[in-house]
Amino acid sequence: MDVPARVSRRAAAAAARMLLRTARVPRECWFLPTALLCAYGFFANLRPSEPFLTPYLLGPDKNLTERQVYNEIYPVWTYSYLLLLFPVFLATDYLRYKPVILLQGLSLIVTWFMLLYAQGLLAIQFLEFFYGIATATEIAYYSYIYTVVDLGMYQKVTSYCRSATLVGFTVGSVLGQILVSVVGWSLFSLNVISLTCVSVAFAVAWFLPMPQKSLFFHHIPSSCHGVNGLKVQNGGIVTDTPAANHLPGWEDIESKIPLNLDEPPVEEPEEPKPDRLRVFRVLWNDFLMCYSSRPLLCWSVWWALSTCGYFQVVNYAQGLWEKVMPSQNADIYNGGVEAVSTLLGASAVFAVGYIKLSWSTWGEMTLFLCSLLIAAAVYVMDTVQSIWVCYASYVVFRIIYMVLITIATFQIAANLSMERYALVFGVNTFIALALQTLLTLIVVDARGLGLCITTQFLIYASYFAAISVVFLANGIVSIIKKCRKQEDPSSSPQASTS
């Protein structure tokens, strides 16, 4: 009588080991990778010197001219980001995230080391290239956590990881402002602190667990799932009983596994090698399917167009502030403005969750109105020669964009699997960067028009105004079509009775 009991316990233990290899136990396994990733995100974004980058480059430390900074150095970041985005997107999935996160940390270290010690135009252009690598590899940070936690934890861990970057950026901005305005530290000292923080982030990244799967190239084979497990689209496992029932001592496993003493132990199948051609074929089919949806296409178009303009305004806002009030002649509050705009934007984003609106009906009109407000904010920032008006307009600009991009993200992600959401996110960002590259090449780059900073912002305001006109026309057409559809059912009975 003891033998079956021992065999039963061995079978239960073997099943438990198999589940531990192929599944993720949300209550026990999610905390460590989430905490490590949040720590990485916090320190990687804790960069007190970033709001003061333009004054630092124009100041005595680097002694560069405005034309060199705006028209020859900053465009390198845009070109690098675009060039690297798609290869990094695929490499992130193929290498399973952690190596790319380490690459991001290393790129940040190189960027801030060069910011401290590199001199000359060419060296700073190389610096911008490494910063482009760091920006392109951000996708690994935001995707990693979905491969090491249970599906039911996605919402919670997403909020934790995004909050970590938000808090890190805000703390860095406030710290930089205090050290400059109150303590009187030099901008060089702020870069030393930034280098230290990104080095800490790089060290933390080494302790991240290596994921066993990814969205596209490294799916968990379905034969490994066992115990009533079904493979879902993101490679995780869904069982027909609650996950909590399996946790305490794995008691539930023993009753679900048929025992056969004559059968040898079952060997776990090896993970199949990724079929690259199949992956690209699936990506292409998903691309066609996703963008054939009119609502998704509408939100994606706004995402790409507005993100292009947002990047341009944020990248060159410090240059406009420097023009309105040179940092050599007065105190500057760039760090405080970045912190305030981030906090108010986060508060507004939180409030979005409580908005009750039929986005299918009024979404395009909302995009029109908010794009028009963004255009007005950028125009005021450019034309009113007051630094405080510039600061206030910038805060309004960032709040509106953060709210709308949150709504767009939700509208796009609501009915997509994780793979398709990652694909749409990557495609939208790539289109935004392609447009930004074109805009930079024509308006900013010294090889193009090489316009002054105030003329650039006038063009950006006109750009957002054009976006608002597009969505106004599209919104009117959509509302008219919807009204006609609502009238058709009521008119058909009248026609039949007559």
From Swiss-Prot:
GO terms for molecular function: thiamine transmembrane transporter activity. One of its GO terms (biological process) is cell differentiation. Its main location: membrane. InterPro entries: Folate_carrier, MFS_trans_sf, ThTr-1. The record marks 104-105, 109, 111-112, 186, 191 as: Essential for pyridoxine transport. Residues 47-71, 127-128, 186, 317-334, 382-386, 445-456 are extracellular. Residues 1-28, 93-105, 150-164, 208-295, 356-360, 408-423, 478-498 are cytoplasmic. The modification N-acetylmethionine is found at residue 1. It is found in: Cell membrane. Keywords: Acetylation, Cell membrane, Differentiation, Glycoprotein, Membrane, Phosphoprotein, Spermatogenesis, Transmembrane, Transmembrane helix, Transport. The chain crosses the membrane at residues 29-46, 72-92, 106-126, 129-149, 165-185, 187-207, 296-316, 335-355, 361-381, 387-407, 424-444, 457-477. It is a multi-pass membrane protein. It comes from the Eukaryota. Glycans are attached at residue 63. GO terms for cellular component: plasma membrane. Induction: Induced in a TP53/p53-dependent manner upon DNA damage. It catalyses: thiamine(out) + H(+)(in) = thiamine(in) + H(+)(out); pyridoxine(out) + n H(+)(out) = pyridoxine(in) + n H(+)(in). Disruption phenotype: Males are infertile with reduced testis size and aspermia. Spermatogenesis fails at the pachytene spermatid stage with apoptosis of germ cells. When fed on a thiamine-free diet, animals develop additional phenotypes including diabetes mellitus, profound hearing loss, and defective hematopoiesis. Pancreatic morphology appears to be normal although insulin secretion is significantly impaired. Erythroid precursors in the bone marrow are almost completely absent leading to loss of reticulocytes in the peripheral blood. Interacts with TSPAN1; this interaction increases the stability of SLC19A2. Interacts with TMEM63B. Belongs to the reduced folate carrier (RFC) transporter (TC 2.A.48) family. This is Thiamine transporter 1. It comes from Mus musculus. The gene is Slc19a2.
